[in-house]
């Protein structure tokens, strides 16, 4: 699993995977955009990437979403998001 350096993202922008998806921690306050794959951590402490499109589509009060490697295809864990 690759986690890009925050300072490098601020200086050069988010890296892209082979599919052209950007990935990394959400540094939108510094770079003005959210990556396609957002760094997240499961309840079990597994770090992975949450697809922005999955997160944006949440409509229920609780939803379990897959976490992926930076390739955006290899599922490694699940994350339960809760909305208010």
State where each predicted segment sits.
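Extended, alpha-helix-rich binding/interface surfaces that flank or overlap catalytic cores
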Residues: 1-84
């Amino acid at each position: 699993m690759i986690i890009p350096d925050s300072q490098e993202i601020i200086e050069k922008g988010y890296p892209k995977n082979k599919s052209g998806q950007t990935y990394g921690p959400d540094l939108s306050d510094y770079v003005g955009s959210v990556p396609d794959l957002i760094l997240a951590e499961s309840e079990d402490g597994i770090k992975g990437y949450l697809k922005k499109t999955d997160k944006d589509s949440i409509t229920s009060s609780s939803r379990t979403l897959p976490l992926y490697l930076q390739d955006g295809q290899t599922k490694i864990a699940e994350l339960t998001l809760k909305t208010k």
